[in-house]
A protein has these predicted regions:
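Feature recognizes metal-dependent phosphohydrolase scaffolds
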Residues: 3-331
Length: 331
């Protein structure tokens, strides 16, 4: 009887502990019940999450100190710091010459710019169709490789609506009962015959870049001496998965946007020192005409040699008048 009594006490304490735990977690359980209203739904999500954790870790891309250099940023973003070229070599290294692989990588980086150049080399309709076929099949193989780190559901969500079904078939088709080359050849041939090859090539290139990098991390200083930080911001706003750690130059621009006179003067000084003040006028609609008039009135005849802006020959040429106007406002 004593043993039974002790067992009952233990059971009561266990039940009390479980009840207290449920009560303590009730608010969390209530929130979970909104998305997973049944035991089956919760179990299904647990299984899906565990399966997702078994996949290879996605590539994370870190970039820092952009300083408004939009052209360098765009190239590094498009090439994923060499990840794209690595995937091209991994898929085609044994079968395709090095220069052809380099051209294909460049096509993936800049499809809209590179595609017309490569097409122009084809001297006949037959040669163009052959190039379309080879390029589409190679891009499909590369896309299949970069998608291997993701679930099929994730890849489907990344597909463009206009051609998502066909791309899904090309990426995930099974060939137990039919010939792979014949199946691909029929689909690719239909794409070319209907004049959609260019669109599919561009969409495949964009999809490869999307899937090649799972997350982008920006570490500080989007703004500074570079000419177009606004382009960088626009691209980051369209990126599928990015986080940003703001730098000291970014905080200065935020302060300027918030109306701090000190921050406004600092931003003006930096843009004038590097002859980037046109960005303030063209991209942010800030009129510097009044500043220029005041500067000409008080400093127009001064020695401005130490106030001359730093210039980049690649962005020139610069006239003497342009440099003078910038220097006098800088002073």
């Amino acid at each position: 009887m004593a043993d039974c009594g002790r067992e009952n006490v233990v059971m009561e304490e266990t039940m009390r502990t479980e009840t207290d735990e449920i009560r303590d977690n009730l608010k969390y359980l209530t929130l979970l019940s909104r998305d997973y209203p049944s035991q089956a739904a919760a179990a299904s999500e647990i299984i899906s999450t565990q399966a997702l954790l078994k996949l290879p870790k996605g590539t994370e891309h870190f970039m820092s100190d952009l300083h408004g250099e939009n052209e360098a940023f765009v190239h590094i973003l498009n090439s994923a710091s060499g990840v794209i070229r690595e995937k091209v070599d991994q898929v085609l290294g044994d079968t395709v010459p090095k220069n052809t692989r380099a051209e294909l990588a460049t096509l993936i980086y800049y499809p809209n710019e590179k595609l017309p150049q490569l097409k122009a080399r084809c001297t006949s309709e037959e040669a163009l169709d052959q190039w379309y076929t080879e390029t589409l099949l190679r891009l499909i193989d590369i896309c299949r490789l970069v998608s291997s780190k993701h679930t099929r559901d994730h890849v489907r969500r990344c597909l463009p609506a206009s051609c998502g079904y066909i791309l899904d078939e090309l990426l995930h088709a099974h060939f137990e009962d039919h010939d792979k080359d014949l199946y691909y050849g029929q689909i690719v041939g239909s794409i070319i015959e209907n004049g959609r090859a260019d669109r599919f090539i561009v969409r495949l290139c964009e999809l490869i870049k999307h899937l090649a990098v799972d997350k982008l991390h920006i570490v500080g200083d989007l703004f500074d001496r570079g000419p177009r930080p606004d382009i960088i911001l626009d691209l980051l706003m369209r990126h599928h998965n990015v986080d940003i750690q703001w730098g000291n130059h970014d905080v200065v621009w935020m302060g300027a946007a918030a109306g701090s006179p000190i921050c406004i003067c600092t931003v003006l000084k930096t843009t004038l020192a590097y002859h980037n003040h046109g960005m303030l006028e063209d991209c942010y609609g800030i009129n510097l005409r009044h500043l220029q008039r005041m500067a000409e009135q008080f400093y127009g005849n001064d020695d401005l040699s130490i106030w001359m802006p730093h210039t980049d020959a690649a962005r020139g040429p610069y006239t003497r008048g342009m440099l003078h106007r910038c220097a006098v406002m800088h002073k």
